[in-house]
């Protein structure tokens, strides 16, 4: 009996040593996972993955010592130490960090709906977008700025009349990151001079600024695209009408040329026929008559030779 007890004790001691080695290996694996897992995939180690690394020898050791092996359902789970709770804490931290990133992403998406857009109905002459951005940036962070140039026809007329050749802008839109900055800009600049240093070229120019409530930059892009489409359709319509007028004019010109050629040919044929008729030799014979009742112009005068002969005879 003592021999059997000694065998059991020796067996349990060997298995306990082997179990300690496995625990150390498991602890090293956990430490390595904690130190080197920066990504989300490396931090997903949990108790189920660690439990798969346990060998059947541990279960036999627990059976020899009278301990029940832990089942997959977790009905009989031995109390874990503080070192074994670190992966769970790490997982909780990663989950919190992930939630924080998601909240930040949602906040950045919602920030697009909190931007403010102002409308500039009048731009100071020859002011460039860089200068306008510098002026508007005094009221807050400016995101996007769009200034609409004058049309080419007015630019040519101005240059032709002796004006400046620089580019002028008629109107513009500016988008602020924060809505309150856009409202502050509209309330401050509307109807007031730009100010600044007295030697500034735009010191005395008056600004017309209006805050567009409920208006977003996407609405502006859609409006500009719609205006471009309408302008393009009008241009195509005008071009088609001009082409029709040109085709009709060319057809009328060709028709008039054809009619003129027909008339000219007809007159030419008539003239040629008249000329041929006038050049024919016509010999008109003189009408004579011996009748007593005939007029004197038609009577044939007596021959002089015959009268001479008769005169000599008598």
Swiss-Prot record:
Q: Where is the composition biased (Acidic residues)?
A: 1-17, 37-55
Q: Where is the composition biased (Polar residues)?
A: 289-314
Gene Ontology terms: biological process? endonucleolytic cleavage in 5'-ETS of tricistronic rRNA transcript (SSU-rRNA, 5.8S rRNA, LSU-rRNA); endonucleolytic cleavage in ITS1 to separate SSU-rRNA from 5.8S rRNA and LSU-rRNA from tricistronic rRNA transcript (SSU-rRNA, 5.8S rRNA, LSU-rRNA); endonucleolytic cleavage to generate mature 5'-end of SSU-rRNA from (SSU-rRNA, 5.8S rRNA, LSU-rRNA); small-subunit processome assembly
Keyword terms of this UniProt record: Nucleus, Ribosome biogenesis, RNA-binding, rRNA processing
Region Disordered: list its residue ranges. 1-95, 260-314
Gene Ontology CC, one term? small-subunit processome
Q: Coiled-coil segments, which residues? A: none
Give the function comment from the record.
Involved in the small subunit (SSU) processome assembly and function, and in the 18S rRNA synthesis. Required for the early cleavages at sites A0, A1 and A2.
Q: What is this protein called?
A: Pre-rRNA-processing protein ESF2
Gene that produces this protein: ESF2
């Amino acid at each position: 009996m003592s021999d059997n007890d000694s065998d059991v004790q020796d067996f349990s001691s060997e298995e306990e040593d082997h179990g300690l080695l496995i625990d150390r290996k498991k602890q090293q694996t956990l430490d390595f996972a904690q130190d080197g897992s920066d990504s989300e995939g490396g931090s997903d180690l949990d108790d189920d993955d660690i439990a798969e690394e346990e060998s059947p020898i541990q279960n036999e050791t627990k059976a020899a010592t009278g301990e029940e092996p832990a089942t997959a359902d977790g009905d009989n789970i031995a109390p874990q130490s503080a070192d074994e709770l670190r992966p769970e804490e790490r997982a909780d931290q990663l989950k919190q960090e992930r939630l924080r990133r998601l909240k930040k992403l949602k906040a950045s998406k919602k920030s697009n709906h909190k931007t403010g857009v102002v409308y500039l109905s009048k731009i100071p002459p020859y002011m460039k977008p860089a200068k306008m951005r510098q002026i508007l940036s005094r009221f807050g962070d400016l995101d996007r700025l769009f200034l609409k140039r004058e049309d080419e026809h007015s630019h040519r007329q101005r240059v032709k009349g002796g004006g400046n050749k620089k580019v002028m802008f008629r109107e513009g839109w500016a988008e602020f990151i924060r809505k309150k900055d856009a409202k502050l800009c509209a309330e401050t600049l509307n109807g007031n001079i730009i100010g600044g240093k007295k030697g500034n070229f735009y010191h005395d120019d008056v600004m017309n600024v209006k805050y567009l409530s409920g208006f977003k930059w996407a609405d502006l892009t859609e409006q500009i695209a719609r205006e471009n489409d309408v302008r393009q359709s009008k241009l195509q319509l005008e071009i088609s009408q001009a082409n029709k007028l040109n085709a009709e004019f060319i057809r009328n010109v060709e028709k008039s040329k054809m009619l003129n050629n027909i008339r000219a040919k007809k007159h030419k044929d008539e003239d040629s026929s008249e000329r041929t008729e006038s050049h024919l030799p016509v010999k008109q014979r003189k009408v004579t008559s011996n009748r007593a009742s005939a007029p004197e112009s038609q009577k044939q005068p007596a021959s002089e030779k015959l009268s001479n002969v008769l005169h000599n005879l008598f």
